[in-house]
């Protein structure tokens, strides 16, 4: 908690997005990859004692890199490291891998509303 988080998703041809992205060349949409990295990132903060049941909101996703397609039958492994967490704002470096090869990465910023409410923002 508070340092890093990781997880994976086994993808099969029955995933709804493979039917439409793209017919004849099914692969996981980039924005769903970023969504998965964002959700994994949030776990680093939401597992800190006192944050159970809280939610985080996406502030930004930058430095997006998509290197390879993620196809049916892949295990999409995600890892996220907390770069900073101050005043309710968290910054993460996240990456996705398939077969130990980097397939995507991003710098993600999330906000924890219960924390940021106590600071006056102009």
Model-identified regions with their sequence ranges:
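Short, hydrophobic/aromatic-enriched beta-strand segments in well-ordered soluble domains
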Residues: 9, 79-82
